[in-house]
Amino acid sequence: MRSYEFHLARMSGATLCVVTGYRLLTSKWLADRIEDYRQRVIADRKKIIRDAAMIRTSVQKQMELVRISVRKGHSHQEAATERNSATETMLSVVEKSGYEPYIISPSPREAEYHGSRQFYSLADFRQDYRRDEITDRHIIVMTDVDYYVDMNELIGLGVPVLMYTFQPSTVSGEVKDGYFTITDDSVHYRVAGGKDVRHRIWNYNQDTMYTVSRPTGFWENLKRILRDITGITALCGFLYNKLGMAPFGDPVTMFTVDQFKMGEHRNIVSIVPFATCRSNLLKISEYGAELEYMRYQQRNNIANFNAVTYISEEGPLISLGLEGNFASVQLPLQDFENVRTAYELSKTNNLSDTVRRSGRPCKEAAIIHKCLQAECVLASEVVHKPGDLARHYQAVGSLYDVDPAEQGKCYAREYAPGPLTQTAVFPNESRSNERATIDGRIAGPQAKAKSREHITPRMRKVARDFVRHLVPEAGLGRPYPLTYVEEQQSKPLQRARNDANRYHDEFTMIVKAFQKKEAYNAPNYPRNISTVPHNQNVKLSSYTYAFKASTLQHVPWYMPTHTPAEIADAVQNLAASTTELVETDYSKFDGTFLRFMRECVEFAIYKRWVHLDHLAELSQLLANELQAPAVTRLGLKYDPDCSRLSGSALTTDGNSIANAFVSYLANRLAGMDDDEAWSWIGIVYGDDGLRSGNVSDTLLTDTASSLGFDLKIVNRAPRGSPVTFLARVYLDPWSSPASVQSPFRTLLKLHTTCDTQSEIEDIGWAKTQAYLVTDCKTPFIGHWCRAYQRNCTARVVQYADYNDIPFWVKNDDHLGNSWPQSDSVDWNDVVANELGLTTAELLKHIALLEAYTGPTSGLPRLTTSIDLEPKMSVALDGEVQAGPSQQQTDKDGTNPTGDRSAPRRARTALPGVDGHTRCTRRSDRGPGERDANVRDKRPRRSMPPSRSVSSVPPPSSSGGGADGDRVEGAARPRRQRRTPV
């Protein structure tokens, strides 16, 4: 009995131990402990590759297209041009990043670089074998070579890779100078001139991937073979499957992938390894995708089909075709899935049914029908759309394009597809564009200004009156200390310049100019930025800052230094004093300054203001601004004469003073006395101005012309009509201070950036966030920005970190006092009218934006067809586009080099259904009725101004002013008009 009890107790104990052990081994506690141990082992064994993040960022920022042409008569000229351009682009990126190229299969042109030359094709036998050592200073460069290389081994070296490669977005199709098909997952590529190759395609369509490297040395391979023979490998595999880790393992390299579009089916791919580990420590397939070959083939018993899905701007597209056939069809993936569902549900299916369901031509529908008959279970690979460079242009013609082989540098990027099918263009950085800049912005305008100038004795007297009115008491001004100027210049580059020049007082006055990086509606002469020596700018700034604070800020027409809310209030105060407002446009304002305006108005004001103790120094600083020797970035010398140096400390205030003087002079010539003419100047900000309509158009333009300026009246707006100032459209400033950013110009460039330093995703968020501050209620602009942000990862941005965002969000005071906005439905009419659409068409597209969910690359685009004529002949999008003819210029009297495109917005009140003028939708209301969304802001005569901006006094007649455009900075506003190019 005791023996039985003993055995029972022993069995119970054993059972308890087994059950307890099993429960313990399968418990979450043990799993967590093993996982924690595995994580610690991974942390100990993984290695971070040095500078990987920095290299990736540098490649993204430095990726600027360099175009290289080939000789005429080349058997496949277009393909060779793109290939050579890609190679030069990659070499440029590597060298600008501070690394050395290591070229695999270099051409004779790259013989000077380190590299590896092996024999992959007959053409390789022209050169000798070589295999230079790869170091940590190298970035590997490949042009059409990755198909033949073991990419797993190459990436396992831990060295960054740049390659130009074929990445088809369809299963067959045309390429430059040839075509391609796909059979057994291999591309068959045929090019004119005899090139005929077959190869597999690597799948780079993930942003982060891994690759497993195989043993390369003799002893490593021997150890692997012994482990396989003795069963150790099988045991390790069992432990790996059960525990997620095991002894031994192959090296695993993790890397990032970025793709940049070069042409149809052609990309530059950047691979940057950032970490290594061992395959035995982690279930790597659960962490991400392994680098593999593309799989196009969809096998079945009837016919082998190829399929690939491409994520385009309009959404996913699927390409289908029989293996080896050139004929293929591409259609939206959603449409194909709908057709396939209908095919499966239908009892009888004929080709005519597929034609009707797909909406495709009969020939394309036949391919779809054949695929449906084959009952392919499609598992197509997905190809992503790479990031694009924005559209760039280059001046052509005998005057500028003296080197036909020159290919300029591109810099602007797109962070999303354009809101419109029409997009802005950017001048590339080239010697021909520099010549066009000097001719179109300085030399040409100076010559025309001198031919127009006609200074009379009366004008000289009026100039003296203007100077005395602005500076009533002479000799009271003193400059601020230079330390004050340095405190205002807080940007890193400004601080560095201050530090470098603090102990150097002497300087040589040489102007160094460069072409401004900015967007244009259509090709135009690039703007010129002319910088002056640092000490000249700092010393002169000590006077301009002091004069601004003591004098300019206290005159009612001066708008710089005011917040957006204050400027909007000033616009409304001006409107309240008159029944008509006038917008004007200065063409090439900086380039049309002549000696009279500089010395008798601008300089005379500063010299009258300054104390005698400082007059000599100020006089020398002002004299330096005239006829200084100048040279462009690429070494072109030119004479700026008396034109405005756009990088000077005088730019904003000097332009504002000149703008105000033209208005004042016109008033005096119209018969007003000094005080009355002063009160009717209007408001100005640089070359932007707005005034009342009590002076005729002819007198305004003739007055400006006699001073050398080229002034045109853009809009004479009666009460209740839209008015534009500082590139913002006021629906009706007589009743509301609300405004919107000029829609057409903004939407052309909203998706682009000239910032080559910041991450493209960060720029996209910062730029859309900035517009949501200034224009969250603006139809289309606000909707597009919200749609972009809704479909990407949120970010926290500091506006001060970005240079390509609206000026009005860079200052905390501006942010807290932004532009007044209104949600009135009348804004839909304004936006639609400027885009050349009906309001219904605009609202339909806005509904698409509000409903869209998906990648930002698929944001809906609105089709527009506004005529945007180039202002000069350029090469753009692979074609030469001619500028306006001289005959057209003579016929219509327009200036082909003007800054403004033909305005699309109705510059008077919108027409009603009966054809008569009306004030947007206000005529739909009965007499005495008001729009609840538009607040009446007209000040009563007995009420004081509601803001700190001095209101324009309301004399007995109506007032004056001039218009212009967007301001990019208080230190240097640049001319970009409401519909500029």
From Swiss-Prot:
Biased composition (Polar residues): 883-898
EC number: 2.7.7.48
Catalytic activity: RNA(n) + a ribonucleoside 5'-triphosphate = RNA(n+1) + diphosphate
Compositionally skewed regions (Basic and acidic residues) per UniProt: 915-936
Molecular functions per Gene Ontology: nucleotide binding; RNA binding; RNA-directed RNA polymerase activity
Alphabetically ordered keywords of this record: Nucleotide-binding, Nucleotidyltransferase, RNA-directed RNA polymerase, Transferase, Viral RNA replication
Biased composition annotated in UniProt, kind: Basic residues: 972-981
Family: Belongs to the nodaviridae RNA polymerase family.
UniProt function note: RNA-dependent RNA polymerase which replicates the viral genome composed of 2 RNA segments, RNA1 and RNA2.
Listed name of the protein: RNA-directed RNA polymerase
Organism: Atlantic halibut nervous necrosis virus
